[in-house]
């Protein structure tokens, strides 16, 4: 079973819906633009998120974008202790994969990484915070997916 390591999110006004949760990569990237009142007091990430962030600087040839992505990776490494993708997460991935397949969608490519993050949340028994809730719609009833909005109520489109 995974141990939940996390950061404390400062509270501005009201208490969040959850005490803890797992942030997907979109939340980590946009963390400074999100309404922190909607985030749990303890927020953790999956090692899969670190893998996505580590690949980011290598996925562009634009030097300024490489630097921005490297900064995001370094901030995430300094801020979060990542939950490992362990045997419990691997077993949970089977359930996630089955739910996505039953919904008629494929679990391939970049989407597969999102589903590995969802499996980490399922194994940890924590809700998954994302900017792309539509990417996880087949997981209703399996993993609680929480939309992380900007202070202006904006979500990202499906990526």
What is each stretch, according to the model?
Residues 122:
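Anion (oxyanion) recognition and catalysis
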Residues 131:
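Conserved acidic donor-binding loop of glycosyltransferase catalytic domains
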Residues 4-21, 31-119, 137-156:
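PIN-domain endoribonuclease scaffold, especially VapC-family toxins
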Residues 24:
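Conserved catalytic-loop position in the HRD/HxD motif
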Residues 134:
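Flexible glycine-rich beta->alpha loop in the catalytic core of nucleotide-sugar glycosyltransferases
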């Amino acid at each position: 079973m995974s141990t939940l390591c996390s950061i404390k999110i400062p509270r501005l006004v009201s208490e969040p819906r959850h005490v803890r949760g797992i942030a997907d990569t979109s939340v980590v990237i946009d963390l400074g633009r999100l309404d922190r009142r909607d985030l749990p007091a303890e927020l953790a990430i999956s090692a899969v998120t670190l893998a996505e962030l580590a690949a980011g600087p290598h996925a562009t040839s634009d030097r300024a974008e490489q630097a921005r992505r490297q900064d995001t990776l370094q901030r995430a490494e300094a801020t979060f202790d990542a939950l490992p993708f362990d045997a419990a997460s691997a077993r949970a991935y089977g359930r996630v994969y089955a739910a996505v397949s039953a919904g008629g969608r494929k679990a391939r490519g970049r989407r597969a990484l999102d589903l590995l993050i969802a499996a980490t949340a399922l194994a940890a028994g924590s809700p998954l915070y994302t900017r792309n809730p539509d990417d996880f719609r087949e997981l209703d009833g399996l993993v609680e997916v929480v939309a992380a909005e900007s202070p202006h109520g904006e979500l990202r489109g499906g990526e």
